Amino acid sequence: MSQSIEGLFAQTLARRHVLKLFGVGGIAALLSYSRLSKPQPTVFQRDRLELPTQVGKPTTAVVIGGGLAGLAAAYELSQRGVAVTLLERSPQLGGKIASWPIQVGEESFMMEHGFHGFFPQYYNLFSLVDELSIQQNFKSLDYYSLVYKDHYDPEVFRPSNSAFPWNIVDLAISSSNRLEWGINLTHLKHLQVFREITGFRNPQTYERLDQLSVTEWVGNDFPKGLYDLYFLPFAKSSLNSPDVLSAGELMQFFHFYFFGNPEGLAFNGTCQDMGRSLVDPMVEAIQANGGQVLTGVTVSQVAWQEGKVAGVTYQNGSVVVNPVPFWVDRNPLLSSETMEYFGAGDSVYSVAPGAKTALSLTCTHQGCSVQRQVTTTAEGYLCPCHGAAYASDGAVLAGPARENLATFEVLQREGDRIQLMAANVDGVPNVAHDLTADYYVMAADIPGIKALFSLSDGEVEPALVSQIDQLQVADPFAVGRFWLDRDFDWQHSWFTSLSGYRLTDSITLYHRIQDDYIAWGDRTGGSVVELHAYCYKEKDFPTQADILDTFEAELYEIVPELKGATVLHRQLVNQKNFAGFPPGSFANRPQTATAVNNLLFAGDWVRMPFPCGLMERAVSSGLLAANAILQREGVQRRPILSVNPEGVLKI
C-alpha cells in the first residue's frame, strides 16, 4: 500500500519539501492511520456531570421558522419539557425540504425543492431518524456518479470506511482520470494546495483563505484536472458559485464531505417525498410533546426591551393577505424603461412607471413566475410552465389558474428597493396575536431573518444588526421536473452530478427512487426526470422561460434517447434564498448563541464550530440552539456529533 501512496504523491517528491510543509508530526499522523480502524464520530458537546434531562420549572420558547433548523430545535426542546410554539410563514413545513401537492393531468404528486442526498456522515440528522424510528423511510442509492460533458470519464463514488489518506488512494486506484489530476507535489504551489485541502482547521484555514474567492484561489497555477474533476462540481454543489464562494468555506466543505469523512460519498434518498419521509414525523413528535405548530402565519413585529426580545406578534396568512410590510430589491436584469421588476426567482413583482401599486408575478396555479407578454393586440402575463394567462392588471384570462395575481401597495422607496404591503386588506379581519416566551430561536432563512430584524420595535443591539445586515444569499437555484411518455436506459446512478453544461448540474430519475413515481412509471411506461441548476447567473437566464427551455434542451443532450419523447408536464422551482458564503464573511457571521441572552439563531447560514454542510448544518445548528437553552436551564445537553473537526495533516 505504501507503494500506492508513493505513486500517487509523485515518485520524485523531495523529502525536505514534505518535512517543511507538514512537519514530522503531520507525516506521523498520515502514516500511522490504520485502514482497518474506521474513525468514529467526534462528540462536540457532552456534559461531564449527570444533569437532569428535563427542565425543572415551566419554560417556554418560540421558534420562528419551520425548516430543518427550526424543527430540530423545536423537537429537542419539546423532548425536554420546554413548551414550544413554532411559527412558519409557508403553508408547508420543512423549508428547503418541504413538499407540496401539484396536479399533473388527472393525477396528484408531491413536489419538492429538488433532490436531497442524505449522506452517512449526517450524524445528527440520522440520530433524529433513529429516535423517530423512521429508518424505513430511506433507501440507499448504492453509489454516486459524477459525469462530465466533455473530455473526462465518469467518476464513481461508493460506500467506504476509509478516511484520508486511504480514500485518496482508493480514488486514485478507481479513477480512470487519475493521470489527468495534474498534481505534482515537487511543485511548491501544488504542495500548498495539498496542505490546505488535507489540513483544515477552524479558524486557521479561514484566516488564510476567507478573503479569497474559490476562483481567485485556483487562478494561480492550480492543478487544472483537479479543479475540473472535483473542485468545480463540488463547489457548485454547495449552492454557491466559485466566483462568490470563500475559499476557506470550500475547504470546510471538502473536509466534511471527503477528507474528514470516513463514510464515503454514497448516500440515501427518501422512499417518498421528504415531507412525508422526515418532516411529518418530526412535527408529530413535537406535537406529541405538547408543542404548538402554526403554519401560514406571518410575524408582523419583534418587540425589544432592555436588550432582550420581549415578544413577537404574528398574523394569520401570508404576506398576500395581511398588512405586514416587507422590502424587496430591484432586479436590473428584468427592468426596462416601461416596467420595473423587483425580486427574483419565484418572488418577482412588477411596477409600472409612477405606479403606486405592484403586481405579484407568482402564478396562482402552482407558483411559477409569469412572464410579461406584449403583442399588437394585448398586453399581459403568461405562465411558462402550464400556460395560465393574465391581463395586465393581473386578472385571469385563461386557465389552469383560477385566481387573479396578487396586488401590493408601494409604501416607500429606498435606493434600489421598495417596501410593499398587500393591497385591499382593509376589510379583511386579521387579528394580531402576541406571544411572549423565555427564549426565542430565529430559524428563518436569510431573507426571513432580515425581514424579522426590519420589523423590530425597540432598541436592538447594534452589533447584532450589523451581523444580520452583512448576510448574503447565493445566486438563485432552479429545479425543473419533467414527466415524459417513455423510459430510457441509464448507466449511471439514479442521482448523478453533471459538469460542463450551461445550466444543469445534476439529474435525478424520480421514477427509480420515490415510490409514487415508481408506481406511475410502472403503470404508464413513462419517466420522471429532474434537472437541477445549483447557482446559475441571472444575467445568463433572466426569465423562467429561459430556464425551462434550456433545461429541456440540455435534457436531450444528457439523454439522447428522450429526443422525440412527449413532455406530459414540466414543473419549475426557482428561488433565491440559499445561504451565501462570500469572501470575507466568516469573521462577522452570526453564531448560534448571541449577545442577547434569550435569543438564539439556527439555520444553514450560521457560523458553526465544527465542519458540516447543507441539511446536516441546518439540523446541527438547531440542536446547538436547543442545547444553549438547556444549558442555561441547568439541563443535560444533547451530545452533538461531527466528523473529525480537523484535517489529519494539521498545519
Give residue ranges: language-model regions.
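N-terminal Rossmann-like FAD-binding beta1-loop-alpha1 element of flavoenzymes
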Residues: T59-T85
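Helical element adjacent to the flavin cofactor pocket in flavoenzyme catalytic cores
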Residues: Y257-P323, E414, D426-H433
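C-terminal segments that line or cap access tunnels to active or ligand-binding sites in enzymes
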Residues: A437-Y439, A444-G584, R589, A595-N597, ...
